[in-house]
């Protein structure tokens, strides 16, 4: 086996320090929705599911997954959405109420520091920071190309009232900022009810089995 030598400068380039974090506060279609307008989105490895072409990405090399983070003050929510690939939350600090289901009423779990939560594909999920200060959820998304986001129907409708639209090729159109709605690419429409009805339901007990709390870990 051939040894792989990694120069110090390359190791330094691949080390993302806290001082290297660059937030995007308009990464998603709900960036003007009251209660969701103070989110910070970070893209450490890959662009994740950011819908903003100006999103800063620390490392663009393909890793087979995407790594990012959501930074949120107390009371701020990330609205209901689903992903095409698996997502893992790592609670980096804070208290988050995670909810799931198209209306967020299928179940809830309150996550604290150190939790690792693996979220199924094709399930609407959202979360709110209920801690006393800013919280950080690290997010790991499977595959190099994640496929984007499907937002809950109510999220898209409310965003439209603030001049925000999403194209079928995952571009955020901000008419307030002067963007023109394209004529050659259709806009994303809310998910049809017939497809929503086919989504798998998860009970609180089933979701708890997908949570690894600090006390659940066994070191060897």
Annotate each language-model stretch with its function.
Residues 1-63, 170-220:
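A short, N-terminal "cap"/entry segment at the start of jelly-roll beta-barrel domains
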Residues 46-56, 66-83:
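Conserved short histidine dyad/triad with adjacent acidic residue
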Residues 55-61, 78-83, 100, 108-110, ...:
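Short histidine-centered beta-strand/loop micro-motifs
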Residues 62-63, 86, 102-120:
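Short acidic-glycine-tyrosine-enriched beta hairpin
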Residues 69-70, 80-82, 86-91, 109, ...:
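His/acidic/aromatic-lined binding-pocket segments of jelly-roll/cupin-type domains
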Residues 73-75, 110-131, 138-142:
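Conserved metal-binding segment of the jelly-roll/cupin
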Residues 74, 84-97, 101-102:
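Glycine- and acidic-residue-biased ligand/ion/polar-headgroup-sensing regions
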Residues 88-90, 118, 133-151:
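A short hydrophobic beta-strand segment most commonly corresponding to one strand
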